[in-house]
């Protein structure tokens, strides 16, 4: 069985962003040489997320609005976490809702997606470097 590991690094210029990372993950898969197996992609930071969905700008705006309703950034004082001097309590909650990782089947050397599925990096407390782990195992 083959095992492949790669780190992808992101630094978005805004507090929140959704980045389609499917091309980078596909490049990792090609480099791994795995034809049949599993591909794990996970955010290695507690205020970032990895998830699968459609790459449609209206949907991304809907996510922004919905997440801000669930866990608004302001007032910063509303979060006990922020009493430590942080201002990102909302980002931790948004990450929890959107998830830490995805696992995608690898079939015949390709990510086995359903219609419209893409892999996204979700950033909820940006403007600094963060990493995503890609781990691929199989034959």
Q: Across the structure, where does each feature detected by a protein language model lie?
A:
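Active-site histidine-anchored catalytic micro-motif
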Residues: 1-139
């Amino acid at each position: 069985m083959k095992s492949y590991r790669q780190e992808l690094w992101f630094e978005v210029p805004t507090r929140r962003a959704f980045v389609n990372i499917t091309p980078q993950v596909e490049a990792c898969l090609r480099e791994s040489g795995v034809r049949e197996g599993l591909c794990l992609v996970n955010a290695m930071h507690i205020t970032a997320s990895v998830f699968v969905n459609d790459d449609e700008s209206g949907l991304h705006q809907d996510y922004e609005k919905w997440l801000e309703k669930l866990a608004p950034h302001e007032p910063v004082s509303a979060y006990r976490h922020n009493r430590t001097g942080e201002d990102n309590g909302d980002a931790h909650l948004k990450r929890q809702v959107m998830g830490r990782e995805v696992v995608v089947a690898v079939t015949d050397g390709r990510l086995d997606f359903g219609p419209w599925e893409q892999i996204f990096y979700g950033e909820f407390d940006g403007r600094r470097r963060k990493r995503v782990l890609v781990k691929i195992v199989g034959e």
